[in-house]
Amino acid sequence: MSWQAYVDEHLMCEIEGHHLTSAAIVGHDGAAWAQSTAFPEFKTEDMANIMKDFDEPGHLAPTGLFLGPTKYMVIQGEPGAVIRGKKGSGGITVKKTGQALVVGIYDEPMTPGQCNMVVERLGDYLLKQGL
């Protein structure tokens, strides 16, 4: 299965009638492997800061998580495994695997829990595959 198929079929799938706003799978080096059409343009620096927060949990807390022009307030996640952010009625979930970051962005009516489930389910699968 191609990386784009993982994004299209496993991240942008319908959950209780709702979809993520956008999603991507990005390498630890910040290069996008696959992304939905609406995924924001981001800087390599954005991904470097996210990777640093996985290595040093709390790194993003003072400044927030930036993805392109959008700033998310970092909320409770799982140190070294999952970063969650909130902005207004939406937010972001980032799951780290051995080689990639699985990123999902949502807005109402999708809930944070639904976004977490979609992103973490694919991330856990990729981890089990050694990816």
From Swiss-Prot:
Phosphorylated by MAP kinases. The keyword Cytoplasm applies. SMART domains: PROF. GO terms for biological process: nuclear migration; regulation of actin cytoskeleton organization. It is found in: Cytoplasm, Cytoskeleton. SUPFAM superfamilies: Profilin (actin-binding protein) (SSF55770). It comes from the Eukaryota. Pfam families: Profilin. One of its GO terms (cellular component) is cell cortex. InterPro entries: PFN, PFN_euk, PFN_sf, Profilin_CS. A motif (Involved in PIP2 interaction) lies at residues 81-97. Occurs in many kinds of cells as a complex with monomeric actin in a 1:1 ratio. Binds to actin and affects the structure of the cytoskeleton. At high concentrations, profilin prevents the polymerization of actin, whereas it enhances it at low concentrations. This is Profilin-8.
